[in-house]
């Protein structure tokens, strides 16, 4: 016999007498739809509500109600009872179906549900016998399957729509000697099965077969009211020695609960038993929790006549017409009861069996773990805490086991956290620290490599790398970094911890170009310092599509400018890299930036890192300054004082400057208006490094001729200065003649004897008539070292030339005065004297002139018919007159074009002559009214 623990998981809700409105002795009970239905021996049926108060009642049968069942799908009540006999040969036992939703009046003060079907149970084909059991199965509405068990071992079955009398009746034979004490329907897939219990056997009918097939499951049966069905459709039979469960294939488990079973039932997974205890002579009502092997409730009761369940309660109806309602306590109350007794395993089983939510289960396990932890049973406590993962804050558990120095248990917990994917970075750090502290390399290997080939690692990668690296487990850290694609970490360990530069270069070469570029930007400084040639080879492959390992070529290659900062302490390597790149790639989008950087490298005297050009390219100025300072601080001081080194540096500087000049020329071909470098930057670099050749080339290309001669002036290179002016001062070749004036001014202010140079300059000034003699005199007079003999011949020639011009102008003036005088005389004559027209022929047609004729003051005469409509002007003189007027209008129009005027003044050798011409033609001689 099982010795089960007893608990009070249920409690009495209320009890009392059944209302007096329920008349007669109670024969049968049923429940459903919030009501308890009672059938009495006087044929009445009564309904009780939730408060066990009388709700309604009606007379179902004239004599007695033996069985009844309240259906679930439809609000029907099926009863079996005795009615009046129609004849002595015909039994009065009837089956009735009542529709409880349809009420009809019975007299003036009562009403009853409508009886929609009446069936005589016993007929000639179905002989009368005592009814011992009754069960109704609701199939697809309106079909009912009713089984009626008899004391002769027969089962009468009725199937169909009783209300419409569309039914089929058949009988099943179990045993001719034993009564049918219990029935139970079960659906097994699509097959309908019927359990039938007698005192001597347990049987099963397959209702799908025709006729139904009988199978005997056991040769020991049960008595009336000791048969029930579980919620899993298992048949339960109670016998004095035990309770047996049956499946479709035979007897299942049994429970040795001794005592004669009076009533059996099933409620929410609990087995309900009313047992006569022979030892004490009491009748006991027990509620069994079979899954958790405990008695959930036990109470001594008086004689029970019926047992049913409704409203979430268990209802016991006693023989004295009193009842007892028993209800289940809430989960919290039950758990508190178990916690007080330290029955944590029972509590866990309880919440799991009743399908409580996972959080509630985890809470119970936490309390159990706390209990075990308090008893210092750390291993078992940790097992419970592991089951709370996902619901209990991990820090609660971790803190406990950190304090207790239980590193093995803590390691186990952290491993489970990672398995479930709930570990944070801190958890990963702690677990790896546990492994390293325990020096458990095997577990560390398992943790690191268990995901090998499966997919993403289920822990924080960077945290794992940091911890392994700090504990000198470099191989593990590198494995994680490589598996997770953390190339920067992999290289960091190789370079900073292991100093394995060859493997680092090999690893970078194996990466995709985009990834390799990123890693080179981060760790290129170290690689350049130790493996410059190999690193430059990798950079060349990245930037020029040469030999990419996996054969994948990028549509957008990285620019060499992106990698310049990795050479911050190695300008020689940078120069070598950019030269190699420029040889291969001629049309790079970053060609200007590359040339700028190369120019700074070529032109700097000490070959420093190109900070100016990089700032122009938009790189971080603070980073550049810091890197340059670091590079300077690392410079070898002996190299600055060693004479041989100085000679070598001077030679190197000369060679680089020559390269710089070649680059200046090559990157500014004649067909380009702007060069492939920053001109302003190039000028600054040449100025800073005193690179005269480059500066002269740039100024000349930019047509800054005055700056060109300024360079010669600064160096007092008189020969080169004059040669430069000869080349750049010829206006016929696009030069600037004013350079000679600047040159003359220079010699006038130099304070040295430069007679030879001045004479040569005066030759070109005189040839191109660049300056007036007075300006030449004033300019050269400032040099005290020059004598008048320098300009004697020049002045004589200019005076002679000016004298000739003055004489020519005097004669022209006299001529114009004579012409003007004659014109004024003619005008006066026209005003004061008459004109005699003596022409005898028409000027137009040359025929004899006759009247009407037209005479003009110009002494031309015409037939009037030859003039036509034009009688106001002479056809012979009009073209010349119009030409003069058109010229006048053009001059007036030109007077408004100021740009043209200044352009002519600027382009002329003698600007004053242009102004005089404008005045002479009367273009700008008229003063306009400012208000007009």
From Swiss-Prot:
Gene3D superfamilies, per the entry: Tetratricopeptide repeat domain (1.25.40.10), YVTN repeat-like/Quinoprotein amine dehydrogenase (2.130.10.10), Zinc/RING finger domain, C3HC4 (zinc finger) (3.30.40.10)
Entry keyword set: Coiled coil, Membrane, Metal-binding, Repeat, Vacuole, Zinc, Zinc-finger
Topology versus the membrane: Peripheral membrane protein
Native source species: Arabidopsis thaliana
Species classification: Eukaryota, Viridiplantae, Streptophyta, Embryophyta, Tracheophyta
PROSITE patterns: CHCR (PS50236), ZF_RING_2 (PS50089)
Tissue expression pattern: Expressed in roots, leaves, stems, siliques and flowers.
CHCR repeat residues: 385-536, 548-756
Subunit details: Core component of at least two putative endosomal tethering complexes, the homotypic fusion and vacuole protein sorting (HOPS) complex and the class C core vacuole/endosome tethering (CORVET) complex. Their common core is composed of the class C Vps proteins VPS11, VCL1, VPS18 and VPS33, which in HOPS further associates with VPS39 and VPS41 and in CORVET with VPS3. Interacts directly with VPS39 and VPS3.
GO cellular component, one term: CORVET complex
Family: Belongs to the VPS11 family.
Protein name: Vacuolar protein-sorting-associated protein 11 homolog
GO terms for MF: zinc ion binding
